[in-house]
Amino acid sequence: MREEKEIIIVCLLIFIVGVVGIFLTTSFNGMKYTSIYIKDYEANLYIGKNLTLEEIYSYEVLEGRKYRMLYRDWKAPLVYNGSLNTPYVKVLNLSTSSKDMVGYVVDYKGDIFVFSDEDWIKRNIEEIVDKYYIRNEVGFYNPLYIRNPGIYTTSYKFVIYPPIETDNVFYHINLKLADEHLPYKNVKINVIDENNSILDLFVYPSTFKVYKTYFGYTIEGSSPKNDPIEVEMLLKPNSVNGFTRYVYNVEGKTISAYKKYTFVSNIVMTLKYLLMAIILLFPLIAYIIYLKFGKEKFYVVPEYLSYVPNKNRKPWIVNLIFAGDAGFFDKEGFYATLLDLHNRGYIKIMNGGKIEILKTDLENLDVYESDVMKFLMKYSKNNVFDPEYIKSLAQKYKSSKDKLKKLKDELDKIMEYPRYSSKVVNAFLETRGKKIIIALLVISILLAVFLYFIPKYSQTFNEVFYLSIVFVVQNIILALTPTSLFGRWKANYYKEKLEWDAFKNFLSNLAMIKKYSPEDISIWKDWLIYGTALGVGDKVVEAMKSLNLSELVADYVIIHSNYDSMKTSVDSVYSSTTGSGGGFGAGGGFGGGGGGAR
């Protein structure tokens, strides 16, 4: 495939990933992907001598016979009868629109109050409470499950005795109305200031709208699943009952915490839209990098070439540079080198995979070919190399990890990672564009890691983190592209690359290759050697079999079967021996919990 098509496909792919990622990230508020959510949450918070909270939850149940409990829990001690000498919430009453549901309260101790005369219902609720270790919860239970989809309403009334920070100038209360809850589609909170006690009000998340009204304040918004909802207030001293503790400079700490929250929130919101823009524009960015560092000159090369484009090019270099992704070397390069050394009279491939060493003068060989010959000579006996001997050595070295690792490294050097591969690649390719892609990948990963560890005050923080993951995925796709796509071939090597591709196409076409005469053995030998280097040696062998060129076919089959087995054996033994082992501001409020269902 020519690189023009490759870059278009890559850009289209990362664009699709970006659009889908943004859609899933920004639309996932829980309501579209759940069988129940809270359509309307309305609360009246009375700021009088006591802090009184009235709540109405309107559940929309989308799937019948799945839920049997609608509840409101607290992350604060809940009492039904009596009082505590620490901050707590007291239940005054509860009601529901459904006659089929039974109310219950589970206090902070686990004591259960069921508003039914039926003993079996009480036992059922007790079993559920024990099973889920329920505490600090008030709600309604339907023993026959909620059968029909529809709207179901529950309401509660509480008196809250919160922790209060004071410096004798201000009272500070931070009330968390929810933090782990179903999605709230519509939120409306009326803060009713009965005695004009509120001096300042701070609402979390900052995306909620706050209106000043004749009775106090109205707060409106929408809350995704588990998004915190908090109301923080500065009040006149001695205006509300609660549990006070002295804190120096209450006003300063409150305002400082809120400013910090809004500052971070604004940064995160800006980062959200910036990431969305980068994600959507990233295909264009990738294309610009390609134009700057990867776009090649146009060459006219036929689709098929029946001759070896460059016979002076060593088979292992053809495998490393032209067979696929430049810089990726595989065992076919090693096998092609063995066939080439056999053809040039340095070795003789024998039955059973053995190799007879015919020449020991390595002066005319390059570095990689010398490494191959040195390996064969080092582990040969009487100038005959036997792959079975390498297998036996691997078994022998099981108890000596250092010797086994040395053997594996020697084998890897000739079958996977030739020396000086990077220098060879740099001789053919200018890789600055690919380095930019790798740098972008590293930056995207560091950003995602940073965002993972910062506190998640609201859904927006989660969205930014998920968007960073989308950006990482886009960069991974680019990083996995061939080196040559964002690199530029030096000199006229791109033309040679196209010629090797055309030659590979020819060798892959059985009908075309079989047209050539079997008498010209030298041509078939070249085709087998370079076809192996290009990864299509099996196609050449298939044609040879049909033309009865059995001798050449035998060499290919012997090498593959015996040396595949040798490499696998060493890797397997090595793997078995190494193994593997094994307050103030947002989030600081009193209360928590929220509306749920089970």
Curated annotation (Swiss-Prot):
Transmembrane segments: 7-27, 274-294, 435-455, 467-487
A Pfam family this chain is assigned to: DUF2207_C
Keywords of the record: Cell membrane, Membrane, Transmembrane, Transmembrane helix
Location, primary (coarse class): membrane
Taxonomic superkingdom: Archaea
Membrane topology: Multi-pass membrane protein
Cellular localization per UniProt: Cell membrane
Protein name: Uncharacterized protein MJ1577
Organism (species): Methanocaldococcus jannaschii (strain ATCC 43067 / DSM 2661 / JAL-1 / JCM 10045 / NBRC 100440) (Methanococcus jannaschii)
